Regions:
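Mitochondrial intermembrane space
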Residues: 9-120
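Sec/Tat signal peptide C-region and signal peptidase I cleavage site
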Residues: 3-8
Length: 120
């Protein structure tokens, strides 16, 4: 995993895998967390990352995983990470490897996210 640390803005780099296909989701802090749209994962899951910061300092990271179904998506996991975040030279694996299961046949979504750009 080669990620640049030249960015001064905090960021989260996630690798999300379903059915052998991996998508990369990149997130940075937003002013309005309600405007963050989830990322569609093979029309089976939704993956959403919300980061907020105050005066350049990261306040929290929220990661939501939903199962897509009718009449509306169902929340499977909400992961919360709160400040303080330790400054590091390289991005650090924040989430570990997460395995999420959903639906009647227990479809598996796997993700892991690295946090970087944290300034002292």
């Amino acid at each position: 995993m080669a990620l640049s640390t030249a960015q001064a803005t905090p960021f989260l780099h996630c690798e999300v895998t379903y059915a052998g296909a991996t998508q990369v989701v990149h997130a940075t802090p937003v002013a309005d967390p309600y405007e963050v749209a989830p990322v569609d994962i093979a029309e089976r899951f939704l993956f959403k990352v919300v980061m907020t910061a105050t005066r350049g300092r990261l306040d929290h990271v929220l990661i939501y995983t939903y199962l897509q179904q009718e009449p509306r998506p169902v929340l499977l996991q909400q992961a919360k990470y709160f400040a303080p975040f330790k400054p590091r030279r390289q991005p650090v694996l924040l989430t570990g490897e997460q395995h999420i299961y959903g639906g009647p046949i227990e479809r598996e979504l796997i993700y892991r996210c690295w946090l970087g750009g944290i300034q002292p």
